[in-house]
């Protein structure tokens, strides 16, 4: 009986740790096509090859966290239809070259690093990609305290 109670106690105590695990942001079945250690950039492509996800990291100046954020959030030739910004992140979405793009940039590693994620996919994939975009956007906020690779 004590053995069973001990096992149950261990299971209960491990629940918060499991709940705080970082979410996997790369969708299942996507293939990595680029891994550049120098620029800390990785690119993934959907199984059908129509959608892509690019992720990269750059150092952040803790004293000027917001300086220059708009410069990296916006690009020429894009029609922005969605923009949200907070002190530690910015999200931009819209159309570019006939495709939909979604870009989110947020502070990570206790404010010492910017994490960038950008998805691009055809307009007709919007409904299919909505869940993926939402999962990635929400999941990125869980990396603020993470200083891993």
Language model segments and positions:
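Generic secondary-structure transition motif, activating predominantly at the C-termini of alpha-helices
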Residues: 13, 70-77, 137, 141
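Secreted/extracellular small peptides and ectodomain modules produced from precursors
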Residues: 8-9, 107, 145
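Surface-exposed amphipathic alpha-helical segments
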Residues: 22-32, 117-149
């Amino acid at each position: 009986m004590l053995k069973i109670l001990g096992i149950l106690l261990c299971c209960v105590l491990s629940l918060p740790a499991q709940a705080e695990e970082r979410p996997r942001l790369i969708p299942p079945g996507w293939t990595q096509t680029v891994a550049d250690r120098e620029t800390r950039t990785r690119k993934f492509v959907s199984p059908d090859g129509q959608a892509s996800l690019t992720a990269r990291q750059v150092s952040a100046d803790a004293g000027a966290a917001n300086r220059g954020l708009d410069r990296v959030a916006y690009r020429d030739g894009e029609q922005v239809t969605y923009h949200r910004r907070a002190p530690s992140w910015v999200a931009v979405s819209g159309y570019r070259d006939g495709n939909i793009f979604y870009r989110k940039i947020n502070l990570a590693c206790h404010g010492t690093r910017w994490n960038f994620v950008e998805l691009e996919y055809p307009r007709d994939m919007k409904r299919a990609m909505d869940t993926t975009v939402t999962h990635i956007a929400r999941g990125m906020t869980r990396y603020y305290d993470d200083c891993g690779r």
